[in-house]
């Protein structure tokens, strides 16, 4: 699919900011500053001809209005010397806006040379992709939306980049990429929802005002927890010991002996290789195929019940699903045949907002990364129930005290190395957005046809989102409409994966037929 850029613009808040503002980001926000958050939404043609003609103008204008509630997203990150409560100066990553020199949002419009259907699952036209319960596997290789999100390096001039791409059929896509220090995926979705409602009120005056919680940009709310458990100076050692006893990802966990990175990652200065990084076996895995697996409610419950039979009640649905797929990927890549010298790791991102009693609308990246590991000959490598239980128990160790210890440790840590560097090998990163409804982002009275995380060429990542709801009023964390899982895998391993009897809920015959052609 050919995508041609038609315009590049700078978008600022519609209301002028009268005085410059600057805030130091929280330590955990800064920890994520070498990464990015990227999401994409695909929409059908607007219902009315006038809406199609005014589409780009309306999107740009409503974005400018939405930025009035998120003016910092038009600002710039920089390091500044800050004086803390102890009167000791420390360089902190600050976000500054309202200066008159704000870079604004990097706003790109583009045109695609294909209909939007080319990027959607072929349901209704290829029955071989579905089973009787509604679960299906979709090979989206070559249709993974790579050209729809801004190929602009962050940490250069802009912290927020947006691309609107129109298609031959009149449909369009919206993609947002932000520096991860400024916004995790939860924050990006909140921003997109506010933009959506601003747009709907602008183009249809009679639309009732739908209530969305106001964004909260207050980095200090997270930082206050990093010292919550400190009663005196002697407690810092205890906190660090507690933090280091947790399986939280830290830069000093990287293996020694970094090797060359594959050219296809096309790394910009956004990513920093750092010291002693374990690159893994990118060279072996080769070009990636991209997949989406849709799990129906019926199959989610079957997998969950199966896990509970093996491991008891201490298993969540998400832990059961990710362990089910992760073990299948391990078998497909034959990691379980490497023996005790080759640990297999699953890194898991988790939001600490709710664990600390903070609102979901808190902007930034209050996200920790923990991990589960085992060797290929461990019994757990043969049981998705036991593994699901391990995942559930690992996440359960992070109570308020443990999260505070991990946050305190981060105050003296280097920024996290991007997953683009250290994933691959026998490591996998799992992220879930099931708590944030990506499909509640409506433009021109129409919801998205497809919503997805925008990663490509990243064979070590698994992303999970809640599927499009048939009933918009459903609670965000129900599974009535199923869930969608996105991941990428090399061709050789893909053939083994979809030949695995354990994945019989997905009729892989159509996919295997594609490999033979």
Swiss-Prot record:
Pathway: Mycotoxin biosynthesis. GO terms for molecular function: transferase activity. Its EC number is 2.3.1.-. InterPro entries: CAT-like_dom_sf. It is an enzyme of class 2 (transferase). The active site is at 180 (proton acceptor). It comes from the Eukaryota. The keyword Calcium does not apply. The keyword Transcription regulation does not apply. Gene clusters encoding host-selective toxins (HSTs) are localized on conditionally dispensable chromosomes (CDCs), also called supernumerary chromosomes, where they are present in multiple copies. The CDCs are not essential for saprophytic growth but controls host-selective pathogenicity. Belongs to the plant acyltransferase family. Acyltransferase; part of the gene clusters that mediate the biosynthesis of the host-selective toxins (HSTs) AF-toxins responsible for Alternaria black spot of strawberry disease by the strawberry pathotype. AF-toxin I and III are valine derivatives of 2,3-dyhydroxy-isovaleric acid and 2-hydroxy-isovaleric acid respectively, while AF II is an isoleucine derivative of 2-hydroxy-valeric acid. These derivatives are bound to a 9,10-epoxy-8-hydroxy-9-methyl-decatrienoic acid (EDA) moiety. This is Acyltransferase AFT15-1. The gene is AFT15-1.
């Amino acid at each position: 699919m050919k995508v041609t850029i038609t315009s590049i613009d700078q978008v600022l808040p519609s209301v002028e900011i009268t005085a410059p503002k600057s805030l130091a980001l929280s330590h955990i926000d800064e920890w994520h500053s070498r990464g990015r958050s990227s999401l994409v939404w695909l929409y059908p043609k607007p219902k009315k001809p006038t809406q199609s003609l005014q589409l780009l103008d309306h999107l740009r204008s409503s974005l400018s209005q939405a930025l009035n509630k998120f003016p910092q997203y038009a600002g710039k990150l920089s390091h500044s010397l800050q004086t803390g409560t102890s009167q000791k100066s420390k360089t902190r990553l600050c976000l500054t806006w309202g200066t008159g020199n704000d870079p604004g949002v990097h706003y790109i419009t583009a045109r695609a040379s294909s209909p939007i259907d080319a990027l959607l699952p072929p349901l209704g036209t290829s029955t071989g992709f579905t089973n009787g319960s509604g679960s299906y596997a979709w090979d989206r290789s070559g249709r993974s939306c790579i050209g729809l999100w801004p190929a602009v390096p962050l940490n250069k001039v802009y912290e927020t980049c947006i691309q609107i791409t129109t298609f031959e059929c009149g449909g369009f896509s919206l993609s947002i990429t932000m520096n991860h220090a400024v916004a995790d995926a939860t924050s990006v979705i909140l921003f997109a929802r506010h933009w959506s409602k601003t747009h709907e009120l602008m183009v249809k005056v009679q639309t009732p005002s739908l209530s969305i919680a106001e964004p909260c940009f207050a980095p200090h709310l997270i930082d206050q927890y990093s010292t919550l458990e400190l009663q005196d100076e002697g407690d810092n050692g205890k906190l660090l010991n507690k933090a280091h006893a947790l399986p939280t990802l830290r830069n000093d966990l990287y293996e020694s002996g970094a090797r060359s990175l594959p050219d296809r990652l096309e790394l910009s200065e956004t990513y920093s290789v750092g010291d002693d990084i374990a690159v893994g076996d990118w060279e072996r895995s080769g070009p990636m195929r991209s997949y989406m697996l849709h799990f129906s409610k019926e199959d989610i419950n079957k997998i969950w019940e199966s896990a509970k039979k093996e491991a008891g009640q201490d298993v969540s649905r998400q832990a059961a699903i990710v362990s089910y797929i992760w073990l299948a990927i391990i078998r497909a890549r034959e990691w379980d045949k490497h023996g005790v010298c080759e640990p297999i790791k699953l890194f898991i991102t988790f939001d600490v907002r709710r664990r600390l009693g903070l609102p979901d609308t808190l902007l930034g990246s209050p996200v920790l990364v923990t991990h589960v590991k085992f060797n290929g000959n461990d019994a757990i490598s043969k049981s998705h129930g036991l593994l699901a239980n391990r995942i559930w128990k690992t996440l359960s160790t992070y109570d308020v005290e443990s999260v505070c210890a991990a946050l305190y440790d981060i105050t003296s840590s280097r920024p996290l190395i991007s997953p683009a560097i250290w994933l691959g090998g026998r490591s996998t990163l799992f992220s879930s957005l099931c708590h944030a409804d990506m499909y509640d982002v409506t433009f021109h009275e129409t919801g998205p046809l497809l919503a997805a995380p925008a990663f490509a060429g990243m064979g070590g990542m698994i992303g999970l989102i809640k599927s499009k709801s048939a009933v918009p009023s459903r609670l965000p964390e129900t599974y009535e409409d199923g869930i969608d899982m996105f991941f990428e895998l090399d061709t050789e391993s893909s053939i083994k994966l979809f030949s695995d009897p354990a994945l019989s809920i997905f009729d892989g015959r159509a996919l295997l037929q594609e490999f033979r052609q």
